[in-house]
């Protein structure tokens, strides 16, 4: 049997699935061809060496993206379309099933929404009594270090859309997902305010560059 490492990316994907591919192999499939003197696999490695992790490539603006040799406006447009389709797929997936049944989908959705933000964004997922998504709202926008959060505004919005439960989320632009004391304090304030209205706070997720910290999973709720 042929060794996995000897297969070209497309063959490897068909044989073992997309999860078996490295970042540069996935990017090579997207790029399709290389440039003169630089085969596609080498070009893919060069691109990732330039940008670093995938999230940096995906969040690059048009100028930064197209400044790299071998990349152009066509690839930029295609990548933006793929990223947006991923966001919409995850949102539709959450709309079709109770969120509590699939916490990993929630994490993936929040990563696609918040991991590239350069300032703190505080988002709330409003859920019905079956824990299905009613809507998502970016309620507060802050600096690179902190965002001002007002529990009364969250509860007001929850009552307006008749939400029975909430999932709180915000990003740390630093990439460090460990909650600060102020994160824990505001979570408790929101939780207390929600309980007065018989609304449950199911979780508070802190989004980094590639992962999420869950208050619920770490027994902080």
From Swiss-Prot:
Coiled-coil residue spans: none
Protein's UniProt keywords contain Hydrolase: yes
Pfam families: RadC, UPF0758_N
Annotated disulfide bonds: none
Chain positions of motif JAMM motif: 170-183
Segments forming domain MPN: 99-221
Binding positions for Zn(2+) per the UniProt entry: 170, 172, 183
Alphabetized SUPFAM superfamilies for the sequence: RuvA domain 2-like
One MF annotation (Gene Ontology) recorded for this entry: metal ion binding
Family as reported in the entry's similarity comment: Belongs to the UPF0758 family.
The name this protein goes by in its record: UPF0758 protein HI_0952
Organism: Haemophilus influenzae (strain ATCC 51907 / DSM 11121 / KW20 / Rd)
Taxonomic classification: Bacteria, Pseudomonadati, Pseudomonadota, Gammaproteobacteria, Pasteurellales
């Amino acid at each position: 049997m042929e060794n996995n490492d000897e297969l070209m990316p497309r063959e490897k994907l068909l044989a073992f699935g997309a999860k078996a591919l490295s970042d540069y192999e996935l990017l090579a499939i997207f790029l399709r061809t290389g440039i003169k003197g630089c085969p596609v696999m080498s070009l893919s490695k060069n691109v990732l060496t330039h940008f670093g992790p995938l999230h940096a490539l995906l969040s690059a603006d048009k100028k930064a993206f197209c400044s790299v040799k071998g990349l152009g406006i066509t690839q930029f447009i295609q990548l933006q379309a793929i990223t947006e389709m991923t966001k919409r797929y995850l949102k539709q997936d959450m709309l079709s099933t109770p969120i509590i049944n699939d916490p990993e989908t929630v994490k993936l959705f929040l990563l696609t929404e918040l991991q590239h933000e350069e300032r703190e964004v505080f988002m709330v997922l409003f859920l019905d009594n079956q824990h299905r998504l009613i809507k998502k709202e970016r309620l507060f926008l802050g600096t690179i270090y902190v965002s001002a959060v007002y529990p009364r505004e969250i509860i007001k919005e929850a009552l307006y859309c008749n939400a029975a439960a909430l999932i709180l989320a915000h990003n740390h632009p630093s990439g460090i997902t460990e909650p600060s004391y102020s994160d824990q304090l505001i979570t408790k304030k929101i939780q207390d305010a929600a309980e007065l209205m018989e609304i449950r706070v199911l979780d508070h997720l802190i989004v980094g560059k590639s992962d999420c910290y869950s208050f619920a999973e770490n027994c902080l709720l």
